[in-house]
Amino acid sequence: MNAERDLSPLTPNIVRALNDKMYEKRKVAALEIEKLVREFVSQNNTAQIKHVIQILSQEFALSQHPHSRKGGLIGLAACSIALGKDSGQYLRELIEPVLTCFNDADSRLRYYACEALYNIVKVARGSVLPHFNVLFDGLSKLAADPDPNVKSGSELLDRLLKDIVTESSKFDLVGFVPLLRERIYSNNQYARQFIISWILVLESVPDINLLDYLPEILDGLFQILGDNSKEIRKMCEVSLGEFLKEIKKLPDSVKFAEMANILVIHCQSTDDLIQLTAMTWMREFLQLAGRVMLPYSSGILTAVLPCLSYDDRKKNIKEVANVCNQSLMKLITPEDDETDEVRQSPATQPDEDFSSNHENSSQHTTYNRTLPSAPDSSLDNANIFAPSSMNTCPVSLNLDGIVHVLDRHLHESTTGMMTRICVLKWLYHLYIKTPRKMFRHTDSLFPILLKTLSDESDEVILKDLEVLAEIASSPAGQTDIVTDCNDLPTGMSELHVPVPTKVTQAHGSVIRGLECSPSTPTMNSYFHRFMVNLLKRFSNERKLLEIRGAFIIRQLCLLLNAENIFHSMADILLREEDLKFASTMVQNLNSILLTSSELFQLRSQLKDLQTPESCNLFCCLYRSWCHNPVATVSLCFLTQNYQHAYNLIQKFGDLEVTVDFLTEVDKLVQLIECPIFTYLRLQLLDVENNPYLIRALYGLLMLLPQSSAFQLLSHRLQCVPNPQLMRPGHKQEESSRAPKEDPARIDYVELLQHFEKVQNKHLEIRHQRSGAGELLERRLVQ
């Protein structure tokens, strides 16, 4: 700059001094400028004041020469000091050139700019608040300055500005929040520290309600919470803690819905502190906001469910997640099963996409997880000024989204045991609270629920059975026409069973056991489908039948009607084409029937056959039990049909006696010695009235080889008393015994013919397999 150039009212000496490289000379020039401006102020000469500021700005502060810029900065500061309380009229002209120097490449010049702005702000105090955003923007950049002197200077200016904001009641929070939202996504540690420090200050000012704008900055706060610096993490943790305290104090004014998806995202963070903090917030939101959170249920479950399988290393997160899960579950009521006439209001309807609306976060952060599809996945920054009364608007349950999340967790092989248990608890809860809506999803859920029966955990299987039992017994699942197994959705397992024809039971005296599965008020159209598909699963997974079959059926007998289960399975097995499986399944069912404490009442019902219903059940079981000869005999023992048992054993001579057959006879002998057949053993005392029982037992004895079972049964039969010893009291006993009523005549001849027919089928199939095996062997030899 030409020092001789006319820059009046600045004198040539002042101009030369301002351009000097020596700081002391520039300082002297600044004092002269201060005197000059004071004189103009006393004269109220605003034109000259503006002219001086313009010269210092254009000719010095914005000059290409570094020393001139330094002179301009100190000159502008001198003007501000001279103006005093009147500096507010000229703040824009004073501040803008100084802020421009914040971007200077020379660190010394940036330091002088800090110093100049400090003096300007110190004089103006509250008058600078209308320019707060530009000051904050400049300071946020200097907070990350690599030069320690510049950073130190910016910190002094920062403290001064915070004091001014704290003292003032005219802070423009509405205008400041967009800038704060933008700057909060900085990745620089110093910039983050600067942002958090300002949030803490604003939180502490009583007249500033930052809580209203929390949805705008909450995501950024959680981003900062993951910073590598412990100090910054601690500051952010304190800030979030203060916000949460305010939320608890004033829940009615909190915009819970606008922050729900932010929490959902951060509840899935891989950073433990972020996840624990977000989960803690979610817990409080669920308890404070209640049903306002229902539209976000699927997203919440997406975040919470995996945490339930955490080990002790993340015990805190697991415990909080469990509370969140329980709280969310309690929000669902039977009213949610009503018609969908009440729609979500626009205020509570979640938006379509979080990332598209969050204009700033999309530039600064990438989320590794995706939320479930609409409507549980959004935040709309446009609603920041919406009234808090939005939280009281009616909400509806998005059951489709919830079921989608639950179904996905059941399908994923990596899902932990506790999570699977919780998913099944959720399904059971939904079938209890919202059965009508849940049955819309039953066809899609049925296959995975059946597959879950193969889970390694007994507890998972128990919960799965509870869900299946509720599906099979809920009145909401009853349809006008019983759904045939051939109508199941694609991919649903089914047995190859002919459609059972509905036979109207004749009023005659002979009972036929070929009717379809029972239809009772407690069973719906899904019950028969469940039985068909359960047997199909046992057929395809013999290991499941072997290891868990008895456990599953026994639990079902506790959850459902045992008679219906056995009646239905017997009816299905009667039409089973895989005869080997049918025999194995009958053997398992028979063992359960005879040994399980859960079936005590059913055994008592079959033991006496005193009602037409019990006789009908016996006939139904008998026809399927014919797939397994020894099981058929044991059923006759249970029902005290000793003569028919003897007749069956007589037919055993025509059967193919295998090792498996003899093993089953051995097990039956062992079973006769158990408490279940105590009544049978006592009946051996009444020799004359139970001759066929003794004959049947001797028949079993003759079938057995010389083994431990043979010795056991032989010793038992040796204890049978001599009929002659029992004869003296026989007449008296016979006269006192009332004749046993026969509630319905059972055609035992027809049943025996059915037994022969079924066993002939088994023999034919075995011969076919044997012949095919021999033919294959001959071909291999040739």
Swiss-Prot record:
Domain-level remarks: The C-terminal domain (residues 523-782) mediates pentameric interactions and is necessary for the formation and maintenance of the PI(3,5)P2 regulatory complex.
Gene name of the encoded protein: vac14
Residue stretches of each HEAT repeat: 5-42, 89-126, 171-208, 212-249, 440-477, 560-598
Family of this protein: Belongs to the VAC14 family.
Lineage: Eukaryota, Metazoa, Chordata, Craniata, Vertebrata
Keywords tagged on the record: Endoplasmic reticulum, Endosome, Membrane, Microsome, Repeat
Superkingdom of this protein's organism: Eukaryota
Organism: Xenopus laevis
Disulphide bridges: none
Biological process terms in GO annotation: phosphatidylinositol biosynthetic process
Identification of the protein by name: Protein VAC14 homolog
Alphabetical list of InterPro entries matching this protein: ARM-like (IPR011989), ARM-type_fold (IPR016024), Vac14 (IPR026825), VAC14_Fig4p-bd (IPR021841)
Region spans: Disordered: 334-375
Described function: Scaffold protein component of the PI(3,5)P2 regulatory complex which regulates both the synthesis and turnover of phosphatidylinositol 3,5-bisphosphate (PtdIns(3,5)P2). Pentamerizes into a star-shaped structure and nucleates the assembly of the complex. The pentamer binds a single copy each of PIKFYVE and FIG4 and coordinates both PIKfyve kinase activity and FIG4 phosphatase activity, being required to maintain normal levels of phosphatidylinositol 3-phosphate (PtdIns(3)P) and phosphatidylinositol 5-phosphate (PtdIns(5)P).
A Pfam cross-reference name: Vac14_Fab1_bd
